[in-house]
């Protein structure tokens, strides 16, 4: 029985680490897609195309949020309208950060949590004298990840409990 408990714990940790790693990879790919799509106009203002990499970025409170931090302001995806999200800090160029769970207040006033991936970048299209830093953050509500973990844990402990009875 002790072996089954240890095996169950190890499988649970491995699943959790894999699920978080997959989430990080997905958030990173959205950040890279936004980085590829956004542009800065001659006056330095940010231009974000109307079509996001994922439709959920357009729906307020969808659970998937994009934010671009600039030296003189920031931009949020339409999905960020409603929930109170923690403000991201400007990251140094080439710095990546994956953090969470971070507390938020959802659009309906309930407490929630997000995971957030950020990447620090530099815009230098007009030469080194005109370059400036910016940071792209992508955040996702923990609800989907929590549900996956719950389903896995129920199945895991159900099967291991059954094996222990045998």
Predicted regions: what is each one?
Residues 32, 55, 93-97, 106-107, ...:
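Short, surface-exposed, polar/charged, turn-prone segments marking secondary-structure boundaries
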Residues 7, 41, 49-51, 60, ...:
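Surface-exposed loop/turn and secondary-structure junction residues enriched for glycine/proline
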Residues 32, 44, 51, 63, ...:
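General N-terminal targeting signals
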Residues 39, 43-46, 78, 128, ...:
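Short linear functional motifs in flexible/disordered or boundary regions
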Residues 1-72, 147-150:
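Juxtamembrane segments flanking the first transmembrane helix
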Residues 74, 79-157:
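Extracytoplasmic
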């Amino acid at each position: 029985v002790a072996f089954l408990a240890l095996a169950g714990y190890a499988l649970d940790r491995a699943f959790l680490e894999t699920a978080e790693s997959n989430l990080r990879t997905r958030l990173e790919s959205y950040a890279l897609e936004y980085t590829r799509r956004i542009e800065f106009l001659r006056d330095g203002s940010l231009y974000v195309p109307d079509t996001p990499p994922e439709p959920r970025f357009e729906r307020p409170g969808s659970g998937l949020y994009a934010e671009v931090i600039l030296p003189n302001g920031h931009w949020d995806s339409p999905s960020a309208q409603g929930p109170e999200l923690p403000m991201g800090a400007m990251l140094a160029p080439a710095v990546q950060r994956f953090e969470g769970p971070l507390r938020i207040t959802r659009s309906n006033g309930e407490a929630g949590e997000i995971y957030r991936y950020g990447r620090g970048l530099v815009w230098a299209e007009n030469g080194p004298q005109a370059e400036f830093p910016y940071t792209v953050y992508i955040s996702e509500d923990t609800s989907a990840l929590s549900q996956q973990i719950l389903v896995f844990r129920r199945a895991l402990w159900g099967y291991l409990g059954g094996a222990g009875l045998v």
